[in-house]
From Swiss-Prot:
This is Large ribosomal subunit protein uL15. HAMAP family: Ribosomal_uL15. Residues 1-41 are annotated as: Disordered. The gene is rplO. GO terms for molecular function: rRNA binding; structural constituent of ribosome. Residues 21-35 have a biased composition (Gly residues). Binds to the 23S rRNA. GO terms for biological process: translation.
Amino acid sequence: MKLHELSDNPGATKKRKRVGRGPGSGTGKMGGRGIKGQKSRSGVAINAYEGGQMPLYQRLPKRGFNKPNRKKFAVVNLGLIQKFIDAGKLDGKADITEDALVASGLVRRKLDGVRVLAKGDVSGKLNITVTGASKAAIDAVSAAGGALTVSAPAAAE
């Protein structure tokens, strides 16, 4: 057997249908597209339609939900607070409150409060009062001789 002697099984291939080539062809004029409408126009694809195969967005399981009244905190790292103190934008000797952080420009908006995280180092004794803080941040400030107080968020009016 040689390569040029190989052929497909009978019925394995179909001839391509030439569409829109006159009434004698059987698929002339409309070319199997019907009359008007989005599907009869060229260049139109229906989004997420996969040719009848179950679409990806339906194959994946539904999972989780978004809490409608979730609290959003402005996040600040200890290293940034220290950087602002070193630059003279924040007073390290006075109590550092959420309003002081906003006034210095470190936090743009308080949102539902400010949360302090432990990234960076603290080189002095700081007294910080905020709505939230990580355990590592509280430990880092107290190790430097300061105090990080977590106050309850103000009730919405």
